[in-house]
């Protein structure tokens, strides 16, 4: 009731501008109150007409801001009610020697404060409730119910808040709601958050893988497109070569025609030159004979005149052969070239007939794998060397892939049967159905391995077993022998069963490594290469609270 009264009273003391309790309240002529700083800033932002922010009444000039003394006194008294008293200092109840030290932790169930040095002492004390629940001493006030002055040890599922027992069961605000112990609910929330975290990490990894695939595919397509561009350029260079060859042949036709014409022209010139030499020779003889006619003695013998006249008559009576001149019909020749140009232009001017989409995005359907992404990431954490988990195309896969087909302990002469994934082969006797979905090989294939080091687990009936190269677990070479169920996969290793679930007594910690069935594949390799004693309880390089069976 008092809390409701305070809330109602506080609503009347809130500034309409800053929505906080008044600070130096002033009153306008319209009787509305504001903080002096708030109304000053509001009027400073609006350089135009001055108005009241609440009733919107306009003023011709800025009115005087009078301090509301009555409201100021009420605000001061209200603020005095909300001044929290400093909490009393808590001291450790376990300190017996000297003055008690200030408490660092407070157990909400036992209501016992303790210092840092006595935290373990308090945890060892018997608790009648569900166990001790320690919080920081500074957070005790936050864990206290302001209405009932009791610690909030329950969690209301409806309101999603921590409540005390009086709020839940004794006519409280949360009566009838589903409640749970706050520690139990905290563990449930932690498990739920861890599960969601694993899912989100798996989704993040999947998205990262998709992005990597997209980036890789982008680079691959860019390389292919660049290669295609080069091939297209070579094709067009061939087209240019064809055009150059056609141009060469066309020019060669012109050159041949010109050479033929020049040959005919030279023959005509040679023939006319011979006729000219003959005419010049006769003309010279005729001129010489004409000079002799000046003397009358010439007439003594005129036979030479008759002979010369006959020759001259023969030379002048024969007609000259008609001269052949060149006639170049360039239009006819250019028409033939224009026909080729038109055909080529018609072929090239048309739109490029792109074939059926030669580059498109197609969905990538992931192939089914035998283990989930979380299991593979868990395995990759144990084995950070990515090359060790490569398939048969990798260095290790090639080394042990061949060993899987050779005759060895537990798989000699056995046919290979396909597993659930198309990437693995498992050795099976007599073509039986596969009991494991990954490649397997005997531990003797490891460095410094021998037949004496073949692992023998009691729950497998003393049978020789193989080691899975992907899941890092044991599997038998016999399919469902003796009615046994398929052997556990990673995450359910038979040699990592907690002590409360394993019925057999745990053996003492060995001082030296003997047969190493309790170690992971990577530790087998390390055990053969590193001197000294192997730490059986640090399988993956980190401390572990689980029990490991080594027999």
UniProtKB/Swiss-Prot annotation:
GO molecular function: identical protein binding; protein homodimerization activity; transcription coactivator activity; ubiquitin protein ligase activity; zinc ion binding
Residue ranges covered by zinc fingers (B box-type): 92-132, 140-182
Zinc finger (RING-type): 15-56
Catalytic activity: S-ubiquitinyl-[E2 ubiquitin-conjugating enzyme]-L-cysteine + [acceptor protein]-L-lysine = [E2 ubiquitin-conjugating enzyme]-L-cysteine + N(6)-ubiquitinyl-[acceptor protein]-L-lysine
Any one Gene Ontology BP term: innate immune response
Protein's pathway: Protein modification; protein ubiquitination
SUPFAM superfamilies: B-box zinc-binding domain, RING/U-box
Associated disorder: Focal segmental glomerulosclerosis and neurodevelopmental syndrome: An autosomal dominant disorder characterized by global developmental delay associated with variable features of focal segmental glomerulosclerosis, a renal pathology defined by the presence of segmental sclerosis in glomeruli and resulting in proteinuria, reduced glomerular filtration rate and progressive decline in renal function. Some patients have transient proteinuria and others require renal transplant.
Self-association state and partner proteins as the record states: Homodimer. Interacts with SOCS1 (via) SH2 domain and SOCS box. Interacts with HSP90AB1; prevents nucleus translocation of phosphorylated STAT3 and HSP90AB1. Interacts with MAP3K7/TAK1. Interacts with PIAS3. Interacts with TICAM1. Interacts with TRIM15; this interaction prevents TRIM8 cytoplasmic translocation.
UniProt family annotation: Belongs to the TRIM/RBCC family.
Identification of the protein by name: E3 ubiquitin-protein ligase TRIM8
Lineage: Eukaryota, Metazoa, Chordata, Craniata, Vertebrata
């Amino acid at each position: 009731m008092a809390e409701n009264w305070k809330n109602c009273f506080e609503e009347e003391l809130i500034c309409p501008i800053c929505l906080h309790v008044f600070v130096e309240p002033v009153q306008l002529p319209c009787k509305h109150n504001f903080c002096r700083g708030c109304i000053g800033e509001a009027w400073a932002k609006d350089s135009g007409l001055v108005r009241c922010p609440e009733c919107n009444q306009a003023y011709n000039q800025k009115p005087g801001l009078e301090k509301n003394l009555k409201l100021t006194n009420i605000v001061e008294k209200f603020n005095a009610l909300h001044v929290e008293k400093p909490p009393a200092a808590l001291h450790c109840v376990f300190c017996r020697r000297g003055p008690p030290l200030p408490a660092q932790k407070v157990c909400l169930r036992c209501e016992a404060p303790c210092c840092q040095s006595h935290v373990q002492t308090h945890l060892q004390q018997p608790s009648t409730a569900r166990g001790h629940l320690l919080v920081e001493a500074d957070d005790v006030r936050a864990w206290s119910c302001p209405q009932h002055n009791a610690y909030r040890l329950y969690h209301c599922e409806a309101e999603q808040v921590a409540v005390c027992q009086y709020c839940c069961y004794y006519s409280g605000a949360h009566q009838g709601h589903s409640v749970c112990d706050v520690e139990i609910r905290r563990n449930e929330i932690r498990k739920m958050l861890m599960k969601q975290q694993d899912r989100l990490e798996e989704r993040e990894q999947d998205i990262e893988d998709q992005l990597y695939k997209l980036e890789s595919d982008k680079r691959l397509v860019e390389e292919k497109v660049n290669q295609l561009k080069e091939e297209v350029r070579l094709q067009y260079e061939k087209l240019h070569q064809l055009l150059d060859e056609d141009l060469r042949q066309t020019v060669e036709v012109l050159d041949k025609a010109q050479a033929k014409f020049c040959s005919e022209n030279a023959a005509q010139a040679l023939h006319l030159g011979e006729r000219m030499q003959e005419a010049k020779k006769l003309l010279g003889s005729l001129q010489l004979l004409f000079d002799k006619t000046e003397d009358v003695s010439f007439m003594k013998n005129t036979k030479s005149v008759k002979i010369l006249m006959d020759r001259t008559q023969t030379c002048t009576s024969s007609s000259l052969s008609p001269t052949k001149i060149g006639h170049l019909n360039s239009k006819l020749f250019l028409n033939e070239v224009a026909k080729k140009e038109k055909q080529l232009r018609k072929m090239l001017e048309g739109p490029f007939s792109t074939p059926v989409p030669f580059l498109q995005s197609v969905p990538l359907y992931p192939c089914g794998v035998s283990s989930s992404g979380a299991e593979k990431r868990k395995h990759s954490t144990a084995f950070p060397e990515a090359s060790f988990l490569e398939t048969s195309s990798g260095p290790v896969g090639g080394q042990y892939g061949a060993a899987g087909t050779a005759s060895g302990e537990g798989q000699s002469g056995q046919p290979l049967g396909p597993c659930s994934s198309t990437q693995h082969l498992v050795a099976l006797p007599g073509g039986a159905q596969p009991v494991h979905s990954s490649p397997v090989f005997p531990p003797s294939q490891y460095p410094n391995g021998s037949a004496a080091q073949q692992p023998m687990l009691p729950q497998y009936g003393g049978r020789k077993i193989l080691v899975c190269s992907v899941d890092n677990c044991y599997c038998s070479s016999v399919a469902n022998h003796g009615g046994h169920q398929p052997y556990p996969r990673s995450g359910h290793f038979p040699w990592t069963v907690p002590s409360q679930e394993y019925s057999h007594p745990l053996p003492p910690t060995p001082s030296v490594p003997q047969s190493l069935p309790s170690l992971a594949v990577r530790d087998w390799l390390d055990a053969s290469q590193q001197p000294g004693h192997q730490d059986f309880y640090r399988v993956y390089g980190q401390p572990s609270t689980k029990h490991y069976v080594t027999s």
